[in-house]
């Protein structure tokens, strides 16, 4: 990373913003040690399960990530970040304990995927919504979101790498111990987190952090109480920016849903590498994503828009084609880095656009609605992924999925210019 970037980025953050970045980094590192290796890796390598089993695991994960995100968004809007964070910690520790205790049979791993998915979804607002509790300044929000994205992507390096070594030395299920250790560290760091709510409610009692959180959610508590999910859905689809963003993410991620259930078989049968490589190649994606977050940090404010997001999403597709296009692990490594760079730009852009558009008192649930579109796009291809893999082969199916991921944002850029210009004006 260029030496001129990090000091500027580091000094621009408040103390609470730095604490938030650390909270997200630690809890997300725990999730990254466990999902791909602990669930998909156990099914593929330890159990010798079929594509159907891994597809079911991803289906369960995605469905319960959606349900968890709705529950987490509602909890955040009702009680604020501190209680939401505590419940996220409890959920992660309980999930890790249960998976370790009950063994690695296929049915148990699938049930573990349910609990892990719900916990990961519940914790999503830490990255997507908490920054808006610290500031409402768009430039500062972009910096915080870029910082969160950067260190979340460091998690994608550190988590799978540690998980890969643990899986190679012990077993794929042992990675859940790492998840629990990382979660405990996140709790320690997050103990001093205090939302800064003066930009929302100037009369908040400075001597009461709990009152500050409640004031931060809305200057009118009765209004906050009446803000239901139906209102949040209406907020998304009556706002041209949010509605278009929902459609962009849904359509762009539709092809990407085929990757999760098939990637482990791509490693085993096409690249012909062991389970440890699942972690190490994921870490390569994290290296790229850190670089992408640096790019996002340096974007001028006028480029924080939907057109830039579409270009980044198209780059995701191109990177995925390089990743799965050959049987050579070296090429896959380069593809993962390219893919990571693109995702490193996408995530902070997406979160900043949502946070500067949605009302704070509904932000948790608005992000849940946006997350639903993202995750449902990943669920839909699971119904046909096993058939496609059996008919065309794993690698050809993944290449086809990469082509879809590339083509959708390209088409939206070419043919949706009028809608993009209208959203930009708003």
Model-found features: residue ranges?
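Juxtamembrane intracellular "pre-TM" segments in multi-pass secondary transporters
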Residues: 1-17, 196-246
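Transmembrane alpha-helix termini and helix-breaking/packing motifs in multi-pass membrane transporters
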Residues: 38-46, 158-179, 269-270, 380-398
């Amino acid at each position: 990373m260029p030496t001129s970037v990090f000091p500027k980025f580091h000094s621009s953050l408040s103390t609470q913003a730095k604490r938030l970045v650390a909270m997200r980094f630690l809890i997300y590192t725990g999730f990254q040690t466990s999902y791909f290796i602990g669930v998909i890796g156990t099914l593929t390598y330890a159990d010798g399960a079929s594509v159907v089993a891994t597809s079911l695991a991803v289906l369960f994960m995605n469905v319960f990530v959606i349900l968890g995100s709705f529950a987490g968004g509602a909890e955040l809007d009702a009680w604020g970040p501190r209680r939401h964070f505590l419940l996220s910690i409890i959920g992660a520790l309980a999930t890790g304990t249960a998976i370790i205790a009950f063994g690695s049979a296929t049915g148990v791993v699938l049930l573990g995927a349910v609990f892990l998915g719900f916990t990961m979804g519940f914790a999503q607002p830490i990255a997507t919504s908490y920054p808006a509790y610290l500031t409402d300044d768009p430039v500062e929000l972009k910096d915080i979101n870029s910082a969160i994205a950067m260190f979340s992507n460091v998690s994608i390096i550190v988590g799978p790498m540690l998980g890969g070594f643990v899986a190679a030395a012990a077993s794929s299920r042992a990675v859940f111990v790492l998840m629990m250790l990382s979660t405990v560290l996140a709790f320690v760091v997050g103990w001093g987190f205090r939302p800064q709510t003066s930009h929302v409610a100037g009369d908040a009692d400075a001597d009461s952090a709990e009152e500050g959180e409640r004031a931060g959610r809305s200057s009118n508590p009765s209004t906050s109480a009446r803000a239901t999910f139906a209102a949040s859905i209406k907020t998304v689809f009556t706002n041209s920016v949010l509605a278009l963003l929902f459609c962009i993410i849904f359509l762009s991620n539709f092809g990407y849903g085929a990757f999760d259930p098939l990637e482990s078989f791509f490693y085993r049968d096409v690249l012909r590498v062991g389970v440890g490589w699942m972690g190490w190649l994921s870490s390569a994606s994290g290296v790229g994503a850190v670089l992408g977050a640096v790019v996002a940090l340096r974007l001028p404010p006028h480029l924080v828009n939907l057109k830039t997001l579409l270009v980044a999403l198209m780059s995701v597709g191109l990177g995925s084609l390089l990743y799965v296009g050959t049987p050579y692990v070296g090429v896959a490594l380069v593809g993962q880095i390219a893919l990571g760079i693109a995702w490193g730009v996408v995530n902070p852009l997406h979160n900043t656009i949502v946070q500067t558009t949605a009302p704070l008192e509904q932000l948790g649930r608005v992000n849940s609605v946006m997350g639903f579109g993202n995750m449902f796009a990943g669920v839909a291809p699971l119904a046909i992924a096993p058939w496609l893999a059996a008919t065309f082969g794993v690698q050809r199916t993944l290449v086809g999925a990469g082509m879809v991921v590339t083509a959708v944002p390209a088409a939206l850029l070419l043919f949706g210019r009028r809608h993009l210009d209208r959203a930009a004006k708003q």
